[in-house]
Regions:
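Divalent-metal coordination cores built from histidine and acidic residues
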Residues: 1-66
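Solvent-exposed alpha-helices and their adjacent loops that cap or buttress functional pockets
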Residues: 8-10, 53-57, 87, 109-112, ...
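C-terminal cap of metal-dependent C-N hydrolases
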Residues: 236-286
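Divalent metal-coordination and catalytic microenvironments
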Residues: 3, 21, 63, 118, ...
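His/Asp/Glu-enriched, well-ordered alpha-helical/loop segment
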Residues: 162-243
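Residue-level recognition of short, solvent-exposed, well-ordered loop/turn junctions
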Residues: 113, 231-235, 271
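Active-site core of metal-dependent hydrolases
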Residues: 65-166, 170-187
Length: 287
């Protein structure tokens, strides 16, 4: 597995992966070219995915699939159904991306099992988790009740303040807060993980809950409870954060701006109990 050999094993920071059920994975993904890998059903490789997952259980934490108008096109939920078979065969959780319909939000979450993860959970209309009347869709509530994990995955088209406000007003908070940084959104609106955390802080989520959603809750979702913990005997990995006060302009994928009074800032990283910086490692000369 090239990614393991050339990236994971050479990285000082720990990297875990979800294995895409498409043989090609995500490809042709840029601001000018976008091809949905899940639309081409000939690329679905369930038998190969099971073999690779079984051979790399130390670094592969689950199975991944993307469905929606932009990622699966006319294939609809078929890639999701195949990915669920792989997840069942390997005993691993599934992470499912959702974008524009079809399929609908309801069709996707109705298929997910306890411990499976829906990412881009607070996406805007169309295919938002809430109704136009400001309520949580019944299928979404049922999914949470049976143990489906709702992950933010803030990228270029997958998070809106309106959806977040509506869901949180109904007491429906994300289980995990993550970014989805790629070529389309690294220059905005997502920018980075701490900006995503800051948005939830300024939307009214308690700081302790924001931090839990990016640490201990993530360890639980990964089924790796040793992650996201500072207890005695834990791995000794941590990010040092501070909260700055001021006036900060945040933007979502719809173009809505939120002026917040706080900003979470990364002050440093600790790996295995020691301070770490990417420019101090063996790849510094390439930076």
């Amino acid at each position: 597995m090239g990614f393991r050999k050339h990236v994971i094993e050479k990285s000082e920071a720990r990297i875990l992966a979800y294995l895409h059920v498409s043989f090609a994975g995500i490809y042709a993904f840029s601001k000018t070219v976008m091809v949905g890998e899940s639309e081409e059903m000939r690329l679905m490789a369930p038998a190969d995915a099971v073999k690779v997952a079984d051979a790399n259980r130390d670094v592969i934490v689950g199975i991944k699939v993307r469905v929606g108008k932009h990622s699966s096109g006319t294939s609809g939920t078929q890639p999701l159904d195949i990915a669920l078979q792989v997840a069942d065969e390997t005993g691993m959780p599934l992470m499912c991306h959702i974008d524009h319909p079809p399929p609908t939000y309801e069709e996707v979450v109705d298929r997910l099992r306890p411990g499976d993860i829906l990412t881009h959970c607070f996406r805007p209309f169309p295919n938002a988790p809430c109704t136009g009347q400001g309520t949580v869709k019944p299928a979404v509530q049922r999914a949470r009740e049976r143990g489906v994990i709702f992950d933010v995955g803030h990228g270029g088209g997958s998070f809106s303040f309106k959806t977040a406000r509506t869901m949180m007003a109904n007491g429906f908070y994300p289980d995990t807060i993550s970014s989805d940084i790629h070529t389309v959104c690294i220059d905005g609106p997502a920018f980075d993980q701490v900006t995503t955390l800051s948005k939830f802080l300024c939307l009214g989520m308690d700081l302790k809950d924001v931090i839990a959603a990016t640490t201990v809750n993530c360890g639980s979702a990964l089924q790796r409870p040793e992650f996201g913990s500072l207890r005695v005997g834990a791995l000794g990995d941590a990010t040092i954060l501070s909260v700055k006060k001021g006036s900060f302009d945040y933007i979502d994928v719809t173009g809505e701006h939120l002026i917040g009074d706080r900003k979470i800032v990364s002050e440093g990283v600790v790996l295995k109990g020691a301070m770490w910086h990417p420019r101090d490692n063996k790849f510094a000369k390439l930076a």
